[in-house]
Amino acid sequence: MLFTSGDWYVDTEKEITYPLVTWMAEQFASLKDATIEINQVDLGDEFAYGFCQVDEDNEFLIHIHNRLNIEEYVTTLIHELIHVKQTLEGMLGHDEREDEAYSKELPLSNQFWDSRQTVH
């Protein structure tokens, strides 16, 4: 289940967000039944484009900087969704998590954009 919150300046109509989350769930089955909230917020003072939190009910909150361009937004959301997948699959080591997320974010971003071009 997907929820959105915050001050949306990137993808205000969620024309990329919803298809991207669906596409990622097709790539990683563990995401299919996850409860995820995407919160666009000004992270300018945080020195980060995004970060992911999980609560005691195993519900995920992804904060994403709301001043990214659409390409940065997609790459960042993919990175954070990889962290959701990792948590669901029990991968908890920080370095291992970041290594995987950074190594997969750009290839997955390119695959997502390619899949969008074949639809139109």
Task: Enumerate the language-model features and the residues they cover.
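Short alpha-helical catalytic segment bearing the HExxH-like zincin motif
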Residues: 72-80
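Short histidine/acidic/glycine/proline-rich micro-motifs that form metal-
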Residues: 8-10, 68, 91-92
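Hydrophobic or amphipathic, alpha-helical segments that drive membrane association/targeting
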Residues: 1-8, 12, 36-45
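Non-transmembrane alpha-helical segments in soluble domains
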Residues: 21-25, 78, 102, 106
